[in-house]
């Protein structure tokens, strides 16, 4: 299979990528860990819409990202097709998307996957955003609240932990209300006070990983390359960074749960360095 849209992909990469680099001034660490040839699966955390730019700009290879089908039904459909993305219908078990991804790997190309299966962003989860807004709805308009949650890149995995603690009567509503704009810091305080364990805080850094990445690696012999994105998407903030982590393979005899846990651990270990 010949890689489609490679010329357009390259043009988009250098035009949009140049603007991205100038605007956000990101850092790239351990780019040498990304293999220059052969089938690979790049896997990382996903909070911001622009997350795929960082891995794409880290390698000369064309990176085929799996993206939700809705993007291909939008006015920007051509861009996603030209970027080599594979549409995924998340409302069903999408065998067509899986077959396309396996074909990419069997041809020796590079695939990008967000193993959490969705963006770990409160701002883009309508129902969960409204649930958290209930704690401050008398103080701030909904649109402004959403804007703050988006700017601060608040994670669903961390707000879910707070709601769990509330349900278990370990905290009260006022605790959430008073700390809703500093959720990560508040969770660290709860860890220090032994209200939550270190493992509970650690697990709040990511949503539970799906098995797609390690499963496809096992079927194709592809190398899994984990990465972690840290920092904020702010103009010239210069703390946005992608760090590539130790690659690994998944043999036919490996346990997928163990390998999926290995993938999650690599990413969370790196995120933990920047969360405290």
Where are these regions (language model features)?
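Short amphipathic alpha-helical segments and helix-helix/interface helices
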Residues: 16, 55, 77, 101, ...
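Short, basic, glycine/proline-bearing loop/turn elements
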Residues: 15-16, 82-89, 195-201
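Catalytic core of membrane glycerolipid acyltransferases/transacylases, capturing the structured
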Residues: 36-93, 100, 128-156, 160, ...
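A transmembrane-helix-recognition feature enriched in membrane-embedded lipid enzymes
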Residues: 1-30, 54, 61, 74-83
